[in-house]
Amino acid sequence: MRPLAGAHTMFSCVDFTPGAVVPLHSHPHEQLGVVLQGELEMEIGGERRALRPGDAYVIPGGVQHGARAHAGPVRVLDVFYPLREDYLKLFK
């Protein structure tokens, strides 16, 4: 799904295949999210959490984080502030 952006905030729906890995990384944007489908393990600032549908997370800007999808498809809804210009350019 294409990201949806307002003047200052955006959201993006992300689908993961089973076993997909998002390596540890950081960005200056605050990121909030909720798991819509499936299960994944997230590492945020050195702390690991198992997340299921309905679970939410908050990632402050500049904090290292990554994820690993478990069996079955995983879908999350991420919200970013400020806008992720890099994401928006990918979908132009």
Language-model segments: residues:
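A short glycine-rich, His/Asp/Glu-containing loop-to-beta-strand
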Residues: 1-23, 78-79
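Conserved beta-strand positions that form and line the central face of beta-propeller blades
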Residues: 3, 50, 66
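Structural motif
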Residues: 10, 39-41, 48, 64, ...
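Double-stranded beta-helix
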Residues: 10, 66-92
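Short, conserved beta-strand element in jelly-roll/cupin
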Residues: 15-17, 27-42
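A short, acidic/glycine-rich surface segment
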Residues: 20-23, 44, 88
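Short beta-strand His + acidic residue motifs that chelate non-heme Fe in jelly-roll/DSBH
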Residues: 24, 42, 59, 65-70
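Short acidic-glycine-tyrosine-enriched beta hairpin
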Residues: 46-61
